[in-house]
Curated annotation (Swiss-Prot):
Family, as annotated: Belongs to the complex I 51 kDa subunit family.
Record SUPFAM superfamilies: 4Fe-4S ferredoxins, Nqo1 FMN-binding domain-like, Nqo1 middle domain-like, Nqo1C-terminal domain-like
InterPro entries, A to Z: 4Fe4S_Fe-S-bd, 4Fe4S_Fe_S_CS, NADH-UbQ_OxRdtase_51kDa_CS, Nuo51_FMN-bd, Nuo51_FMN-bd_sf, Nuop51_4Fe4S-bd, Nuop51_4Fe4S-bd_sf
Keywords: 4Fe-4S, Iron, Iron-sulfur, Metal-binding, NADP, Oxidoreductase, Repeat
pH dependence: Optimum pH is 8.
Protein EC: 1.12.1.3
Reactions mediated catalytically: H2 + NADP(+) = NADPH + H(+)
Name this protein carries in UniProt: NADP-reducing hydrogenase subunit HndC
Enzyme class: oxidoreductase
Pfam short name (any one): Complex1_51K
Organism (species): Solidesulfovibrio fructosivorans (Desulfovibrio fructosivorans)
Function: Catalyzes the reduction of NADP in the presence of molecular H2 to yield NADPH.
Molecular function terms, GO-annotated: 4 iron, 4 sulfur cluster binding; FMN binding; hydrogen dehydrogenase (NADP+) activity; metal ion binding; NADH dehydrogenase (ubiquinone) activity
Length: 490
């Protein structure tokens, strides 16, 4: 069967085995060259393994994009009686890239952690996973048990004298625990709060020992890189962003779900060729990349290459791979408020800019969406966002204002309409809506009068009705019920 356009645009490395093997069968994984990478690195020196990962150009897929090989090299160079390899499987935002890999190919992560352990001199690994992923936990536990039974974890792996084992620790899904120092504190039984760096975890992390924290997708790339070589991986992508990236397509788009594409592909190709564009003939308006802390990109950005530097230049981020598409019916002020509501709720509260600043930002946006905003509010919104971005302690706070700053930059006219005209161009903000009836279309059927909870619609049967706008609570029930499109929302 010929590949569809959607499939042709994709390249699966991190998700290469998902859907093709029984995730609970170690034999299925081994049949597709599983643990071959681990066997190969045990014939190399740790420095050679680190150098191979460096030359591949792999960057952390958890959001920051720090070169994985350099991070491993720092841990290798720090002498200690114990080192730790940690897998961050605690997806705190509403995306499921890590979950898909752990449920569909858990052995790729187990093997990669063992490879990483050998490379930095660690004998212990920990997967920090959110407790809300019961199937992923079940399959990961089985993968670890089976690997031990086959002699691929534990003592004297492949008769090489290398010892490495893995345990699980459970998180509660806090978004801030995606930050590596907060994650480590949580693993130690402390409150999940970030700490000032340096020292970096690769220097002093879990129990003050050198610790490498990589996310699931980063680890999933490692065995393929070891088997196929650094040149193979670095030949995919762009000059600064190598390999592929897994994205979760969501929102107003025909084809939702997970995709894996080469770095450097354009947003246009992802949204329209793979995603199929917006449904119901609606016009594309924006795409939020990078999850709740990302930025909104508009039509003018559709031909931007998806890599770390290009997205940053557009005031957005790669993040962990969220991609939410919005159409003509979405209000960008409400979108910014929606994402801020999430990050405000997820702040750990340790630093003042994030704890208090997020609340002040939300209050300003709330006033604007309720028709009470002023031009001074717009100035305050922008200046406070910039201050928080520069002064917050960790990445959560530093990227929190991204949705606000990007929408204010690209959709300034919408903010101005909310403030100056007290109108929501997308007809989303309830407080700024007005419902009226078009007498030319109204048949006087009475359906609207029966659903109005405050009885503010009046009229004679089979004659045009009217809405008392002074009593209307703008619930939209009449608009949804009318079969003749006679209710006007503006």
């Amino acid at each position: 069967m010929a590949a569809t356009t959607t499939e042709k645009k994709q390249l699966r490395i991190a998700t290469r085995n998902c859907g093709f093997i029984d995730p609970e069968s170690i034999d299925d994984y081994i049949a597709l060259r599983g643990y071959e990478g681990l066997a190969k690195v045990l014939t190399m020196t740790p420095a050679e393994v680190v150098d191979l990962v460096k030359r591949s150009g792999l960057r952390g897929r958890g959001g920051a994009g720090f070169p994985t090989g350099i991070k491993w090299g720092i841990a290798l160079g720090n002498k200690a009686d114990q080192k730790y390899m940690v897998c961050n499987a605690d997806e705190g935002d509403p995306e499921f890239m890590d979950r898909a890999v752990l449920e569909g190919d858990p052995h790729s992560v187990v093997e990669a952690m063992a490879i990483g352990g050998y490379a930095i001199g660690a004998t212990r690994g920990t997967v920090y996973i959110r407790a809300e992923y019961p199937l992923a936990i079940k399959r990961l536990k089985k993968a670890i048990d089976d690997a031990r039974e086959y002699g691929l974890l534990g003592e004297n792996i492949f008769g090489s004298g290398f010892d490495f084992d893995i345990e699980l620790k459970y998180g509660a899904g806090a978004f801030v625990c995606g930050e590596e120092t907060a994650l480590i504190r949580s693993m130690e039984g402390k409150r999940g709060e970030p700490v000032t760096k340096p020292p970096f975890p690769a220097q002093s992390g879990y129990w003050e020992k050198p610790t490498i924290v990589n996310n699931v997708e980063t680890f999933a790339n490692i065995p393929a890189i070891i088997i196929n070589g650094a040149d193979w991986f670095s030949g995919i992508g762009t000059a600064t962003s190598k390999g592929t990236k897994v994205f979760a397509l969501a929102g107003k788009i025909q084809n939702v779900g997970l995709i894996e594409v080469p770095m450097g592909i354009s947003l246009r190709e992802v949204i329209f060729d793979i995603g199929g564009g917006c449904p119901d003939g609606k016009a594309f308006k924006a795409v939020q990349t990078g999850g709740p802390s990302g930025g909104a990109l508009a039509n003018k950005d559709l031909d931007v290459a998806i890599d770390y530097e290009s997205l940053a230049a557009c005031k957005s981020i790669m993040g962990s791979g969220g991609m939410v598409v919005m159409d003509e019916d979405d209000c960008m002020v409400s979108v910014a408020k929606f994402f801020l509501d999430f990050t405000m709720d997820e702040t750990c509260g340790k630093c003042t800019p994030c704890r208090i600043g997020s609340k002040r930002l939300y209050e300003i946006l709330d006033r604007i969406t309720k028709g009470k905003g002023t031009r001074a509010d717009l100035d305050r919104l922008k200046s406070l966002s910039e201050i928080i971005k520069d002064t917050a302690l960790c990445g959560l706070g530093q990227t929190m204002p991204n949705p606000i700053l990007s929408t204010m930059d690209t959709f300034a006219n919408e903010y101005e309409a909310h403030v100056d005209d007290k109108k929501c161009p997308a007809h989303v903000c309830t407080a700024l809506l007005t419902y009226t009836i078009d007498p030319a279309k109204c048949t006087g059927c009475g359906l609207c009068t029966r659903v109005c909870p405050v009885e503010c619609i009046s009229g004679t049967k089979k004659q045009p009705h009217t809405i008392d706008t002074t009593r209307c609570i703008k619930c939209g029930a009449c608009y949804d019920k009318c079969k003749f499109d006679s209710i006007i929302k503006q």
